[in-house]
Amino acid sequence: MLDPRLSVAPMVDRTDRHFRFLVRQVSLGVRLYTEMTVDQAVLRGNRERLLAFRPEEHPIALQLAGSDPKSLAEAARIGEAFGYDEINLNLGCPSEKAQEGGYGACLLLDLARVREILKAMGEAVRVPVTVKMRLGLEGKETYRGLAQSVEAMAEAGVKVFVVHARSALLALSTKANREIPPLRHDWVHRLKGDFPQLTFVTNGGIRSLEEALFHLKRVDGVMLGRAVYEDPFVLEEADRRVFGLPRRPSRLEVARRMRAYLEEEVLKGTPPWAVLRHMLNLFRGRPKGRLWRRLLSEGRSLQALDRALRLMEEEVGEEGEKEKPGPRGQREAAPGPAREGV
């Protein structure tokens, strides 16, 4: 059964396997999504590079984009074979590239095609096929139109709807589309009341766990995006307060785990910066956090991370962890729980 309560949004050039691994160290319960992946890339590209992920990343969803039912169905089959727990169809990307390719938000103009796509994908796989959509297009959305779109997709077998609670303005940039169209989370709340048999996840502009908890009283789930990338420890209390799991490790312990991960990845030929760039915000708002960023940005190596870690060990200590007497009476940090992501 898909647990929709809390998830991290698919973000292009952000939610790759390295960032997802980092997030999993902060929260065991949160649901992870890949970057948006076009169906043709799955069919013709390097599948191992595009789709491979570590077992620790579960639960994880593959987000696909495209406009051809057969191609998307085949891409969904491939994703399921790789072990993804969910296949999500992007109906929200407003970018010029998406419009040229006939996928993303512009597909909302052709609900008959959307239904055909979703039916084909649903018949191709056994895992849930879900959608991530906007309220509508060009600021002309109405609640009635949104509800009709949901009904049409539900008839095609979709049970889970992730709704970015904004319209898509196709003449604007992707960044502007995250900021200019007004948020209408109340429409998503209303959808849950009108379609109680369906699952609704609201998304857009949610910056804190407190905000997420507010919406969780009204809908089935909340998806956070940029806030998590800007500070992964927005999710610090998510396991305890949302999933009833023990509190996760401190920032310093997560940094140490990422150091071990980076060492392993470098041996596989991964450029260090591919991992380090996602770690820049790990100490956001903390003492010496800016120096941490600078050391990683300038050094871009395992050695640079080691220097930054030594700095944080001296300046921050074992944040959030109890201390116990050392062998000679000095104070030392008690070891954190030896839990790894599952």
From Swiss-Prot:
Can you provide one Gene Ontology molecular function annotated for this UniProt record? Answer: flavin adenine dinucleotide binding
Site: Interacts with tRNA. Where? 90, 97, 175, 178, 290, 293
User: Which parts of the sequence are annotated with region: Disordered?
Assistant: 313-342
The record lists the catalysed reaction(s) as: 5,6-dihydrouridine(20) in tRNA + NADP(+) = uridine(20) in tRNA + NADPH + H(+); 5,6-dihydrouridine(20) in tRNA + NAD(+) = uridine(20) in tRNA + NADH + H(+); 5,6-dihydrouridine(20a) in tRNA + NADP(+) = uridine(20a) in tRNA + NADPH + H(+); 5,6-dihydrouridine(20a) in tRNA + NAD(+) = uridine(20a) in tRNA + NADH + H(+)
Recorded hits in PROSITE patterns, A to Z, give: UPF0034
Q: Give UniProt keywords alphabetically.
A: Flavoprotein, FMN, NADP, Nucleotide-binding, Oxidoreductase, RNA-binding, tRNA processing, tRNA-binding
Q: What is its EC number?
A: 1.3.1.-, 1.3.1.91
Pfam families linked to this entry: Dus (PF01207)
Q: Which cofactor does it need?
A: FMN
Q: Which CDD domains match?
A: DUS_like_FMN
Which domain of life does the UniProt lineage start with?
Bacteria
Residues engaged in binding FMN:
10-12, 63, 132, 164, 203-205, 225-226
The residues responsible for catalysis, as annotated, are: 93
SUPFAM superfamilies associated with the record: FMN-linked oxidoreductases
Feature: compositional bias, Basic and acidic residues:
313-331
> A GO term (biological process) for this protein?
tRNA dihydrouridine synthesis
Instruction: Spell out the disulfide connections.
Output: none
PANTHER family assigned: FMN-LINKED OXIDOREDUCTASES SUPERFAMILY PROTEIN
Q: What does this protein do?
A: Catalyzes the synthesis of 5,6-dihydrouridine (D), a modified base found in the D-loop of most tRNAs, via the reduction of the C5-C6 double bond in target uridines. Specifically modifies U20 and U20a in tRNAs.
The similarity annotation says: Belongs to the Dus family. DusA subfamily.
Q: What is this protein called?
A: tRNA-dihydrouridine(20/20a) synthase
What is the native source organism of this protein? Thermus thermophilus (strain ATCC 27634 / DSM 579 / HB8)
- Name of the gene: dus
